[in-house]
Amino acid sequence: MHLVGTVETGVGAASRSLAPLLSIIREASSLKDLQPATLNVRLSSPYVLRPTFTIFGSEVGRDEDFHFEVCSIHDLKRVRAFLGVIMRTSTNYHGDDVLEVMAEVNLRERMGLADGSSVELSLFD
């Protein structure tokens, strides 16, 4: 499955919220250099996450659960892709039409993205 969306600025809460959980997320995803920042991608229609793994808030002293789906993010200008995860909390602050994407690189910098840039993601069955 492929999703296409537009990059937009987030509120910065994910980086602060995910930093203490980063070692758990890295272990569960096998992405050893995963960065705590997320890239917000707005879709034209809602997407219901199909979690690859979940970190339950009750197990890490949090009020919400953290759901993750493995994906790849495509840099169409340079014909390459980065493995990553889509993160969504159980409270789903942004709604189903925004994805928060994490990767082992800063996606904005590495892919030369700005607000309004188009991004393609591939999801695995």
Model-identified regions with their sequence ranges:
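Long, compositionally biased stretches
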Residues: 1-95, 115, 119-121
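Active-site scaffold segments
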Residues: 97-103
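Short alpha-helix capping/helix-loop boundary micro-motifs
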Residues: 103-109
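A short glycine-leucine-enriched loop at secondary-structure breakpoints
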Residues: 110-114
